[in-house]
Amino acid sequence: MTTRTATSTSTTVHGHLGDLKLRNAAITGPHLQPKAAKQDLADTKPDSARTFPGLGFKLSPTEERLRAKRNWGFLETAYDNSKVMGLTTHFVTITMAIVFNKSWLAKPVYDWLNTYDRFTIHTVHTWILLSTCQLLVIGLFALTDLSGRPSWLARYRMQPHKPPTLAQYKKLIPVVLFNLVVVNTISNIIYYPLAEWRGIQTTYETLPSGKKLVAQWLVCLLMEDIGFYTVHRALHHPRIYKYIHKKHHEFSAPIAGASTYAHPLEHYFSNLVPILVGLLITRAHISVQYLFFTGLMIGSHVQHSGYNIPFLTCALVHDWHHYFNTENYGPVGLLDAIFKTNKTFKAWTSETVAAFHGDRAKARQAALEKLAQIEAEEQERIR
């Protein structure tokens, strides 16, 4: 197989062909990638002044220069949120869980929960909690997307020139509801006997300590990254992609509801199974199960929202994946770092952030050096 290497960056070409060439350059390495969808390639065509939607604010000179070359990530404020800042959501939800478990409310709540049989706890109650959380998050983003309010949020969009539409929401609702009602229910039913086999506890008396809860959460997060990365990258194989994962990539500029806009098999094996594996390995208490599920549910929808809002889950990484249809396969980024499936993304963002700091020449040189290093590594691998 002939390997294509990254030999250029978007700063060396004119117009939106910069996006296209960088997208092609990103499709490298020993893994095969599908051809970009037609609607993705169409995104590289420059918008005329007449068709370009009003953003409600003026672009800075640097943003205008980037906008002239790129269709993704040309707003400076979209980079205000970092992956470290994005951990705030997890910190808050974990803290709330620990505080609640130590509060006077915990015993009556868990005692009430256990008035139901264990099948109901693991299936019905879990489904109600996750469904409520998912629909609430989708609903909040839908109100923002369709009303345009609060208007300041538009400043945090990675692709502000492609505002969400009512037609998109109408398109995804049937698929999202099917996965929510049918696939999630089947998943809970399959999970129940496995949870019984592993002896997963649900009572107040068996609540984990704060340290144990955090430790189990971290193991679950690691298993989620390993499982999701593996399945997701496999789904990008061209022999599989068009049958399953292509559906999810119909949204090159994703919206929150697109998180579970996926083929049922993908939703189960990619979105759900990696989470369940971690819970089973750690024999996590039902409280950890609820915490982990809801935290990931919020994070996944924020990652697909199109907004990189400070102190919410960082959405830059996954929004890049949807636009360029390559790299950034994992939700955490650990395996992407190990297998270097984030190298073009890192070169791009390093160049862009440097440009916003006023040193465009240095930014361009840094990007060229990074891509030259990538090319050298690929040539060495071929030898």
Swiss-Prot record:
The keyword Isomerase does not apply. It is found in: Membrane. Glycans are attached at N342. GO terms for cellular component: endoplasmic reticulum membrane. One of its GO terms (molecular function) is C-4 methylsterol oxidase activity. Its main location: membrane. It is an enzyme of class 1 (oxidoreductase). Keywords: Glycoprotein, Membrane, Oxidoreductase, Transmembrane, Transmembrane helix. It is a multi-pass membrane protein. Disruption phenotype: Leads to the production of UA derivatives that lack the alpha-hydroxyl group. Induction: Expression is strongly induced under conditions of nitrogen starvation. Expression is positively regulated by the cluster-specific transcription factor rua1 that recognizes and binds to the specific 5'-T/G-G/T-C-G-C-A-T-A/T-C/T-C/T-G/A-3' upstream activating sequence found in all promoters of the UA biosynthesis genes. Coiled coil: none annotated. The chain crosses the membrane at residues 84-104, 123-143, 172-192, 214-236. GO terms for biological process: ergosterol biosynthetic process. Its EC number is 1.-.-.-. It comes from the Eukaryota. Fatty acid hydroxylase; part of the gene cluster that mediates the biosynthesis of the glycolipid biosurfactant ustilagic acid (UA). UA is a secreted cellobiose glycolipid that is toxic for many microorganisms and confers biocontrol activity to U.maydis. UA consists of 15,16-dihydroxypalmitic or 2,15,16-trihydroxypalmitic acid, which is O-glycosidically linked to cellobiose at its terminal hydroxyl group. In addition, the cellobiose moiety is acetylated and acylated with a short-chain hydroxy fatty acid. PANTHER family: STEROL DESATURASE. This is Fatty acid hydroxylase ahd1. It comes from Mycosarcoma maydis (Corn smut fungus).
